[in-house]
Amino acid sequence: MTAANIEGALERNRTFAAGGGHEGAVVFPNLRLFVITCLDPRVDPAHVLGLGLGDAIVVRNVGGRVTQEVTNDVAFIGQMAEIMVPDGPLFEVAVIHHTQCGAGALADDAFRRRYAERIGAEESSLREHAVLDPTATVTHDVERLRSAGAISSRVTVSGHVYDVVDGLVQTVVAVDRVLAG
């Protein structure tokens, strides 16, 4: 029997805990930043953006897409933040898509059909989650968040594309306020 893949990470956790790395961590992010990005390990925002513990809230999913669940998460954090920050801006949501995204496979009919069967989803609903042109998809997702009625107008949203080849994140949709709320 081989050791579990998590064993090395658990050992590093013990070192982290013994060193007190968790002490003083805050619930509300230090940078007032909420990052939505892909679950691809090449796009780890702690490394790509140089984030430390407590700097940002990070939500990761296939393609870094703004789904209803992600919108609900932003709305929840916004409502919590309104309690802690009675006036002024609450936080910025940075939507980050990336080049060479595996979510592009959702554009392939055969792949999408098999995946839909596997997860029990409507195949037609999955096509819109494909990331073939990250500039276009991040722009779409930023607009989706900005027009979501459940999100506070004190939240700002921006859109970015991370190039996995050169390692740079480029802003493609400048920061602006949520329209609704």
PLM region spans:
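Conserved beta-strand-loop surface patch within small alpha/beta domains used
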Residues: 19-75
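The start of beta-strands in P-loop NTPase/AAA+ ATPase cores
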Residues: 55, 92-93
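Short beta-strand segments
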Residues: 36-38, 60, 94-98, 160-163
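Gly/Ser/Thr-rich loops at beta-strand to alpha-helix junctions
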Residues: 39-42, 99-103
